[in-house]
Every structure is written in structure tokens, then in C-alpha cells.
Amino acid sequence: MLLVVGGTGDLGHRVVRRLREQGNAVRCLVRPGTDDSGLLEIGVDVVRGDLTQPESLRAACAGVDTVVATATVIGRRLAGARTPSIHEADEVGMASLVDAAEAAGVERFVYVSYAGVDAALGTPLERAKLATEQRLSRSAMRTVIVRPEAFQEVHLAPLGRFDMGAGKIAVIGKGDTKQHWVGTDDVAALVTAVAIEADPPAVVEFGGPEAISRNEAASMAEELTQHRMKVQHLPRSVARLAIRLLDKRNDALASIFGAGLLQDLHESQCDDEPLRQRGIKPTSAGDYLREQARLLR
Ligand SMILES: NC(=O)c1ccc[n+]([C@@H]2O[C@H](COP(=O)([O-])OP(=O)(O)OC[C@H]3O[C@@H](n4cnc5c(N)ncnc54)[C@H](OP(=O)(O)O)[C@@H]3O)[C@@H](O)[C@H]2O)c1
């Protein structure tokens, strides 16, 4: 039995679907009040609970061999949820999940972090991800840390202030640093693979097949839509200040500024080899943008 924590999320649901398609028994920890119908339809066993409720995590882990943790509270915080904070859910809550998994005799723990998590930008999400990676490094379970690059569907989309339809793109810093933007579905395929393959690596860092900068992506958007994009640049110094000022007041926004700054500071060091090794044919950033432009027509 695999337990997925975060199975109602964008990445998490894709992982659950793939695990079920491959015939695996899957349980999901779902927060009280969240719609579980999409999970029940595909034969998932649903246990209600929350990362901030340790007793629910103990019940969820009973009889489980592998835990896959994709959950993060950042999306709900951005949507206005006052509690829990990133510290409470992504850091303390994840530590409780690791404790519960160990106590239940779970053999493997797959955790979704991100590439560049060690860049020391000092955001709440970075602290939570690093603390969880460190907690897992002390565990006797077989642990797999998955570190994908920025997702195409988030950072090359309106949500990530890359709005081809409205012709508006925000860039932190110069925007010339190349990134291997990766498709969420390709990340899901890799997370699924390392959850079930016989001998998974301890850390897997990867991105999509094509490295392009945000400025190059913006030029591509102009060519594809035949419309001029209004590109708004925010200096790195302002992003650093925003991270510091928002740290306590708005942990999600501070972390979003951190993600943008990371994309400008951190030249992507990884490629799509871990995907190809597993037979996954990844979508390039260019193909993703071409498809988005086609949908806009
Ligand atoms: N976006 C990127 O570019 C990027 C890059 C690298 C890594 N990542 C990582 O990839 C993962 C993204 O996953 P996703 O797309 O599935 O995120 P998502 O769509 O925001 O979903 C978050 C999931 O976490 C669950 N959750 C939130 N708070 C919880 C709590 N207190 N207890 C239990 N579950 C809780 C949510 O449940 P509800 O549905 O009930 O809210 C939902 O299932 C994250 O770990 C993120 O840090 C993202």
C-alpha cells in the first residue's frame, strides 16, 4: 500500500492516477472538507486528516510500505487561508509525517522538494523543504528526495505572472538565466517511478529537455502570439527586500518572490536525463508554450 499525502493537488493527483493505472493500492490523506470524489472514482482509499494533526498521520500510515509526500500549504496560503502557516504545515507537519511513517514501519519515503533549495535565499518554503530533507537524511527508511526545476504550468503561466493571453510577463532581475522548465506531468511520471522502482536514488534532481531564460520565453511568446508582451522587470534588490519584509507577514508571497529570484540567480545545473532513463519523453518549454499559444487562438 502506498500513501500519498497531497493527492488532491495538481502534481499529487497526477501521481495518484499513474500509481493506480499501474495497478498499485493507494491511500490518500485528505483534509476534512476537501472533495475526495476524484480519488474515490479511481479506487483510492481515503483517510481524512491533516499534516498539522499528528494522530491522523499515525492512522494514515498504518499498513503502508511507501509514503509519497507532495503536499504543500503554499497554494492555500496564497488563496488567503490564515492557518496553518508554511512553517506549521510544510515543516512541523512534514516532520510529524516522517515520525508517523517511521513508527508504522514504512520502508520508503519519497519527498518532493525543489532544485536550488540550497541557494540560501531565506524563504519560509526553503526553510521547510531543507528541514524536511535534513529530517529524512537522519531516517533509517529508504528516502528519495525529488528536486524538480520550476514547473512549466506554474511559472510559464498566468499563475506565475507569465500571461501570454493578457500580454503581461513579470521578470525578477535580468531574466537571462537559463532554466530547464519541466512539465508537471513529467514530474508526476518520475515521482511515480521512484516510488515503485527497485533501487531508487537517494536524491534525484532534474528538469525539462530545453534550457531557456525567462526573456527567451517572453520573446517566444511574442513570436507565437504575434503580440507584443509587456515585460515588467523587478530588480533583484527589491525581491530580496520583499522576502525579508514579507517573511513573517505573508510567508507564501515571500516564498514566491524567492522562487522568482532563484530563477534569476541559479543557472540550472540539471537536465532531463533522470526522466529519459525511466522512459519518460519530457515536454520542452518551447513545446509547452506552442501548445498554450494554440489554445489561445
Ligand atoms: N511549482 C513548482 O514550480 C514546483 C517546483 C518544484 C517543486 N514543487 C513542489 O511540488 C509540489 C507541488 O504539488 P502540487 O502541484 O500537487 O501542489 P498543490 O496543487 O498546491 O496541492 C497541494 C496539496 O497539499 C495538500 N495540503 C495542503 N495543506 C495540507 C495539510 N495541512 N495537510 C495535508 N495536506 C495538505 C492540499 O490539500 P487540499 O486540496 O485539501 O488543499 C493538496 O492536496 C510541492 O511540494 C511543491 O513544493 C513545485
Annotate each language-model stretch with its function.
Residues 172-177, 204-211, 222-226, 234, ...:
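Glycine-rich Rossmann NAD(P)(H)-binding loop
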Residues 154-162, 194-204, 227:
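Glycine/proline-rich active-site loop of Rossmann-fold NAD(P)-dependent oxidoreductases
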Residues 73-165:
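Glycine-/Pro-rich loop/turn segments that contact NAD(P) or position catalytic residues
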Residues 219-266:
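Terminal hydrophobic/aromatic helix or amphipathic segment near a protein terminus
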Residues 270-297:
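Amphipathic terminal alpha-helices
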Residues 30-103, 118:
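NAD(P)H-binding glycine-rich loop region in Rossmannoid oxidoreductase-like domains
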Residues 173-195, 202:
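Substrate-positioning beta->alpha
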Residues 2-24:
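N-terminal Rossmann NAD(P)H-binding glycine-rich loop of SDR-like oxidoreductase domains
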